[in-house]
Amino acid sequence: MNIAADIVGREAGPEPAAIDLRWLMAYNAALGEVSEAAHALFPVCYEWPANRTLRVASGLQALNERLVHAQHDLVIHRAPRAGETLQVAGRIVSVAQRRPGAFVVMRMQARGAAGDAVSTTDYGMLYRGVQLQGPTRAIEKAEDPPQHEAQLPPVGEIAVAATAAHVYTECARIWNPIHTE
């Protein structure tokens, strides 16, 4: 199995994402929080449709069983608000061969009605056992996270209900088998 290096630059969107209060509150509830404000990780919800569209358009969807969500760098420019419709676009910004497989980074960008930046995410996917056809390519810089200087000690345990994955999937509106199967 291969991923062609020439997928760099492929785009999807912009696609509209209508943010409603029910969605904001449901996402918070799935994480055990009670709030009407957008959770810091809520952007994954409105980015999901454009993410899927981009994977289909670039031929990556056929390799989903090999995909590991390996990296996630989210910049929040401002919080999304209930009642607004964002425009979400995605673009593949880099590909590289790594020892375990091909590594692909897509950049998701959400903008408000006035064109103002709401969030930017570099979403890194490792395709295990897949080879990159062609050289490493990048049209935008997407940095690896810094390495920890020391191993982090455990801080405790968190009980996770057997139904948590299903609740999260429904409340996030991210219907992805990785959460539930």
Regions found by a protein language model. Give the residues of each.
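Hot-dog-fold acyl-thioester-processing enzymes
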Residues: 1-69, 132, 136-140, 147-181
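HotDog/MaoC-like acyl-thioester-processing domains
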Residues: 1-10, 71-160
